[in-house]
């Protein structure tokens, strides 16, 4: 996990986002694929966790709550992790809104991605069979005066304790186990993640989630 801001790629300007055309009595209407899936309450965390993407996800979560506060939101995650503060903005919003947020790992959920995967509603945290998860302690690299380095070092230790507490809460592991297991990069296959408590089930087919 890093607390540095990264620029988000503008995938909409690359021409690589598929468009979906729907027919209605009023004629045709075209949506980009992500907007169409948003109508089905499906949202995505894809790529690094950074401020721009976090703001988009927070906005989508709040919008879907306003649309229907009693219907689940489905968050698909394929992320290597990234900014701690951006990830915690998403995390806090997931816990704040009324709808359950069901999480599903496709590909990988590492670092903050793994924390957000584990933060889904109890019983609704899933991963596909060949996905992988990774947990570790926050990363930090600072330069400057010794006093400033000391301030940042104490802050990153405080952040580590906060993240470990969150993981312990959602996985059911005790805090000392989490502290030891996040000391270095700790990779898990889907089945191992289920045993650890990061997810509830490994899904092999659409029907398995029902």
Curated annotation (Swiss-Prot):
Annotated keywords: Cytoplasm, Hydrolase, Protease, Serine protease
One of the Pfam families matching this protein, by short name: CLP_protease
GO molecular function, one term: ATP-dependent peptidase activity
Record's keyword annotation contains Ligase: no
CDD domains with a match to the protein in the record: S14_ClpP_2
EC code(s) of this entry: 3.4.21.92
Catalytic activity: Hydrolysis of proteins to small peptides in the presence of ATP and magnesium. alpha-casein is the usual test substrate. In the absence of ATP, only oligopeptides shorter than five residues are hydrolyzed (such as succinyl-Leu-Tyr-|-NHMec, and Leu-Tyr-Leu-|-Tyr-Trp, in which cleavage of the -Tyr-|-Leu- and -Tyr-|-Trp bonds also occurs)
PROSITE patterns for the chain: CLP_PROTEASE_HIS, CLP_PROTEASE_SER
GO process annotations (BP): protein quality control for misfolded or incompletely synthesized proteins
Annotated catalytic residues: 111 (nucleophile), 136
Tree of life domain: Bacteria
Top EC class for this record: hydrolase
Principal location: cytoplasm
InterPro entries noted in UniProt: ClpP (IPR001907), ClpP/crotonase-like_dom_sf (IPR029045), ClpP/TepA (IPR023562), ClpP_His_AS (IPR033135), ClpP_Ser_AS (IPR018215)
SUPFAM superfamilies recorded: ClpP/crotonase (SSF52096)
Function: Cleaves peptides in various proteins in a process that requires ATP hydrolysis. Has a chymotrypsin-like activity. Plays a major role in the degradation of misfolded proteins.
Subunit structure: Fourteen ClpP subunits assemble into 2 heptameric rings which stack back to back to give a disk-like structure with a central cavity, resembling the structure of eukaryotic proteasomes.
The protein, known as: ATP-dependent Clp protease proteolytic subunit
Origin organism lineage: Bacteria, Pseudomonadati, Pseudomonadota, Gammaproteobacteria, Chromatiales
Record gene name: clpP
